[in-house]
């Protein structure tokens, strides 16, 4: 057991403050009425803040998530230690595009990794910088071609990502 168990608890109001002070708060400053998502890199945010704050993130922790999401993450070789806990899309431009990611959040202090396509800094707060991809896909889109599942499964991970863009 831990030696200083009590120090792991937050002071009154501290947990709520931590929950409400993540990158979601910076995303809300954008006042963007479109339906899109944001991805992040090493922001230190807590899980499920997007659900609480009313934003759309690529990060969540939900034990009854659709199994196809885990399957997709496995097929894309995303490093997800648990099937129901997703942190981000690994900063992969292709996956961000497919997931309708319009914004990318990093910590303000020091430059973090910003994927290709996020050229414009949309907003800066005390803690975060949010970049925008002006070519983000909408949340819903359709394909006019397809490949059989058997053929798809034989592709490498990079070929699978490329196939999803066709």
Go through each PLM region and give its residues:
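Soluble catalytic regions of membrane-associated enzymes that act on cell-envelope
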Residues: 1-166
């Amino acid at each position: 057991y831990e030696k200083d168990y009590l120090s792991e608890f937050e002071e009154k109001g501290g947990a709520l403050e931590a929950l409400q002070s993540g990158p979601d708060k910076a995303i809300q400053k954008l006042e963007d009425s479109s339906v899109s998502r944001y991805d992040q890199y090493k922001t230190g945010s807590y899980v499920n803040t997007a659900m609480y704050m009313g934003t759309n993130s690529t990060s969540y922790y939900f034990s009854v998530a659709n199994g196809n999401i885990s399957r997709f993450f496995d097929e894309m070789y995303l490093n997800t230690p648990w099937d129901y806990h997703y942190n981000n899309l690994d900063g992969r431009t292709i996956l961000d595009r497919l997931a309708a990611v319009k914004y990318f959040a990093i910590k303000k202090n020091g430059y973090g990794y910003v994927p290709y396509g996020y050229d414009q800094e949309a907003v800066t707060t005390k803690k975060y910088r949010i970049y925008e991809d002006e070519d983000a896909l909408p949340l819903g889109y359709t394909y006019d071609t397809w490949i059989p599942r058997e053929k798809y499964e034989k592709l490498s991970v990079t070929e699978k990502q490329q196939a999803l863009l066709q």
